[in-house]
Design a protein with these regions (language model features):
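N-terminal hydrophobic/helix-forming segments and targeting peptides
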Residues: 1-177
Length: 177
């Protein structure tokens, strides 16, 4: 038996740096473009910097087509040239994640945060490890966390190919209620 949460989250990846300093991004996971316009994001560089930015797109009155897709989004970090962006250590492939605070709901019964389903699943996996660590079973039990759930359940597939379990219990949560 394998029990696992997943520890990846949706986000973006730097795909191009424009001459004017705008950063074009690729979606990672199931994202809908227009909901991200004006959202604060951070570019995480390979040298450890966390650079703030905001997601924008070409204004409707300046568009030459009606492309409102996620691929049309641009991250603005305040740089005025490609050279300036590169001087910050930003490169193709860097992660871009949106910023969401971790807060309680007004009634104090729930939490609001990005990737809460992932965190919930990983937390349950840790609780299961703690609970079952000294128990004996007549079957093998593997507890952990997978990655790449947001891009096609790849980690869970790799785990099942590796362990060949009779049962895989995926720990995840609904984003609403």
């Amino acid at each position: 038996v394998v029990v696992a949460g997943h520890m990846d989250e949706v986000g973006f990846m730097v795909r191009n740096i424009k001459p004017n300093g705008g950063i074009e991004v690729l979606p990672i996971g199931g994202l809908v473009g227009e909901v991200f316009i004006s959202q604060i994001v951070y570019v995480y560089t390979k040298n450890g910097h966390k650079i703030p930015g905001v997601i924008g797109s070409i204004p409707p009155h300046l568009k030459t087509n009606n492309n409102s897709s996620i691929e049309a989004l641009i991250v603005d970090i305040g740089a005025s040239s490609k050279e300036e962006v590169l001087s910050y250590g930003i490169s193709i492939g860097d992660m871009v994640l949106y910023d969401t605070p971790y807060i309680e709901t007004f009634n104090g019964k729930r939490f609001i945060a990005k990737a809460i389903d992932n965190r919930y699943g990983c937390g349950l996996a840790l609780e299961a490890l703690e609970y079952f660590h000294d128990k004996t079973f007549d079957f093998n039990l593997a507890i952990g966390a997978t990655v790449q759930e947001e891009v096609g359940l790849r980690g869970a597939e790799t785990t099942t190919n590796m362990f060949k379990p009779d049962m895989f219990i995926a720990l995840d949560a609904s984003p609403l209620n």
